[in-house]
């Protein structure tokens, strides 16, 4: 894969976690306008491959393909392990309808297990991310407020605080995003529990400019118990047409990539 393609495709790493944003802002946005722009970048249908390095000592590296179709009203996201060989085929389907979440875990050769709303905070493939981090975007929450400004490594950022409204169940009481106002890239996201303790922190460790857009190339996720996961993207195809069957428990048993994805 050439460098140009690799740079462009890494933007999905941020899209998955609410980090990949459009290009330079020309005027200050209100909190709700900013959240709307963030949410818009997560919408659409995509096929992606990423690499996860899990752990801070002897790292475990897994390669994953992601199929997604997301709108304001609903979302379906599938994560499937391609490597290492002993874990190939392990898959997770996550579904959102409004503010309700569900899912399915598939372990080869034929083990299917449902994920209930109470299990959304469980780890994705042993990483520092939870199922909830993947399927529930804080930028879709009803309460959005700009609570201050702060420099991140010399870069001025607006701090956007997101809180779930009534009827929205989340294990987080609030989420703060440090957004580079010039490039509209969140350089940090912190997720808090009800006591105000940081449960997860997501740092953008490298940003590149490509085609007028500033894209997060590398992310580092710090989770509960000192867990650490480094995520990089390697391939992206937008505007993919998926059959409904690909977002079903039975569809998890297939590792097929969409035509034209370069797989």
Regions found by a protein language model. Name each.
Residues 1-7:
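N-terminal secretory signal peptides that target proteins for export/translocation
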Residues 11-22:
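Bacterial N-terminal signal peptides
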Residues 28-43, 60, 86-88, 96-173, ...:
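Flexible, processing/modification-adjacent segments and terminal tails
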Residues 39-46, 209-213:
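Edge/loop elements at the starts and ends of beta-strands within beta-rich repeat scaffolds
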Residues 50-55, 82, 161-165:
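Generic short beta-strand segments
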Residues 122-124, 130-137, 151-248:
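Gly/Pro-enriched, hydrophobic low-complexity segments
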């Amino acid at each position: 894969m050439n460098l140009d393609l690799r740079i462009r495709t890494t933007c999905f790493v941020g899209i998955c976690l609410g980090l990949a944003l459009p290009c330079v802002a020309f005027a200050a946005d209100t909190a709700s306008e900013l959240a709307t722009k963030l949410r818009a970048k997560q919408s659409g249908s995509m096929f992606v491959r990423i690499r996860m390095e899990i752990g801070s000592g002897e790292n475990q590296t897994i390669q994953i393909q992601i199929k997604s179709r997301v709108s304001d009203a609903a979302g379906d996201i599938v994560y499937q392990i391609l490597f290492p060989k002993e874990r190939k085929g392990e898959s997770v389907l996550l579904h959102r309808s409004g503010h309700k979440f569900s899912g399915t875990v598939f372990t080869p050769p034929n083990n299917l297990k449902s994920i209930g709303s109470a299990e959304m905070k469980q780890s994705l493939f042993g990483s520092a991310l939870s199922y909830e981090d993947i399927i529930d975007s804080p930028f879709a929450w009803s309460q959005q407020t700009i609570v201050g400004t702060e420099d991140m490594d010399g870069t001025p950022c607006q701090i956007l605080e997101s809180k779930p409204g009534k009827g929205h169940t989340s294990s987080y009481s609030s989420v703060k995003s440090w957004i580079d106002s010039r490039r509209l890239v969140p350089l940090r996201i912190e997720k808090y529990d009800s006591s105000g303790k940081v449960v997860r922190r997501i740092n953008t460790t490298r940003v590149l400019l490509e085609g007028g857009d500033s894209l997060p190339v590398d992310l580092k996720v710090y989770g509960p118990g000192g867990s650490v996961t480094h995520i990089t993207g390697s391939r992206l195809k937008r505007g993919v047409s998926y059959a409904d069957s690909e977002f079903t428990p039975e569809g998890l048993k297939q590792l097929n990539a969409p035509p034209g994805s370069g797989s």
